[in-house]
Amino acid sequence: MLANYALIGIFLVAAISFPLIPLVLAFFLRPKRPTPLKTSTYECGLEAIGDVHVQFKVQYYLYALAFVIFDIEVIFLYPWAVAFNAVGLYGLIAATIFLLMLFAGLLYEWRKGALEWV
């Protein structure tokens, strides 16, 4: 019984140390002084034109956030679709309520103008 816990412990130590060791090594082996070339934006090997820091509209992030939210909701609907015959009326009611809440969120985003591109 103790051997099983030892294997789990060894696995956890290996799983934690596997990504941490390269990060620590990179931290100590990297060059300490950044050069102006390293802080500039890379544009296909050409000299940077204009300011290096580009501002993005918040609208792009709102679209990305809405996509992630609705994508995750579709993942939550997959088990219900697989077990559709087994869940019965209670599962149908629960999924309908879930979809109505999703639709309400979509309407809210639409009315607030989060889906307007311009």
UniProtKB/Swiss-Prot annotation:
GO terms for cellular component: NADH dehydrogenase complex; plasma membrane. Pfam families: Oxidored_q4. Its EC number is 7.1.1.-. Keywords: Cell membrane, Membrane, NAD, Quinone, Translocase, Transmembrane, Transmembrane helix, Transport, Ubiquinone. One of its GO terms (molecular function) is NADH dehydrogenase (ubiquinone) activity. It catalyses: a quinone + NADH + 5 H(+)(in) = a quinol + NAD(+) + 4 H(+)(out). Disulfide bonds: none annotated. It is found in: Cell membrane. Signal peptide: none annotated. It is an enzyme of class 7 (translocase). It comes from the Bacteria. The chain crosses the membrane at residues 8-28, 64-84, 87-107. It is a multi-pass membrane protein. Belongs to the complex I subunit 3 family. NDH-1 is composed of 14 different subunits. Subunits NuoA, H, J, K, L, M, N constitute the membrane sector of the complex. HAMAP family: NDH1_NuoA. NDH-1 shuttles electrons from NADH, via FMN and iron-sulfur (Fe-S) centers, to quinones in the respiratory chain. The immediate electron acceptor for the enzyme in this species is believed to be ubiquinone. Couples the redox reaction to proton translocation (for every two electrons transferred, four hydrogen ions are translocated across the cytoplasmic membrane), and thus conserves the redox energy in a proton gradient. This is NADH-quinone oxidoreductase subunit A.
